[in-house]
Amino acid sequence: MSSKEIQVRQNQELQLKIQYAARECYNTAEKLNYWVWGLCILSFVIGFLPNESGSVLLSVGSILCDVLAFLLNIALVKKNSNAAMLRKHFDDCVLKIGCEECSTSRETFELVEKICAKHPQKFATQIKNSGTDSPPGVKDWYSFSKKYEGSEAQFECQRMNAWWDSKLSQWRLGLAITSTVILMGAVFYLAPIKGIWTIIVCLVGIMLKLIERAREYILYYQLSYKISGVMEIIRLNQPPDEKALVVLQDLINQRRS
């Protein structure tokens, strides 16, 4: 195993398709997340519309928003799960950490082909472009500043994965904090007008989403702490030990899901 072998293997047609499909799943999950938040907020706003007439319709509208948000959240989780599975499969096939052989199941292959066939022009651009091109693509996913050999090459890829995932999560955390601050401001402003119990009822969807997101971040930072610890141990014990790389890869896969 060397950095050169990884560069060749990652640009094989099937691996490029897998990376493209994983990116599409993550992007779709992100869009669904915005829709879920939007529906939760809309449900909250509906609860404060004038209800002298048509109060039943307003209540039904609020409930429909919550139900639709729930269904979209299920689809979001499925997309995110597929993306994490595809990224794991890509790393298994390209890095071969803890596994010498890698085979793509029929179910995974059909999923990848279906996603790639949906937008053929976009797919063609993505597999042709690298991350530094415009628009950024999936070619040359792992780029090396120098030549690495053996387990050092595998560890360098894991280091890049840990950095990318951390950067993405910081952006999401900032968005969640901003949303929470805006929500708290709205609650304090509206509570004297509508009453605290009305506020609580209208906030059910948003509160469930915030609890879900808080749970995700707690798990994320627990895994990040473990990842940092294992990476530090590997850095202090060169060349990287195969068993330590397997443990690190498992933690990275858990954090993606």
Language model features with spans:
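Charged, amphipathic alpha-helical oligomerization/scaffolding segments
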Residues: M85, H89-D92, K96, Q154-C157, ...
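Short, non-transmembrane cytosolic segments of multipass membrane proteins
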Residues: M1-E5, S103-E149
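Alpha-helical transmembrane segments and their immediate juxtamembrane boundary regions
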Residues: Y26-K79, Q170-K226
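Sequence termini and other peripheral, non-core segments
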Residues: M1-L49, S53, L86-H89
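Membrane-interface amphipathic/juxtamembrane segments adjacent to transmembrane helices
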Residues: R9-L14, F70-I115
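Cytosolic/matrix-facing juxtamembrane and C-terminal tails of multi-pass cellular membrane proteins
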Residues: S2-K17, A21, A214-S257
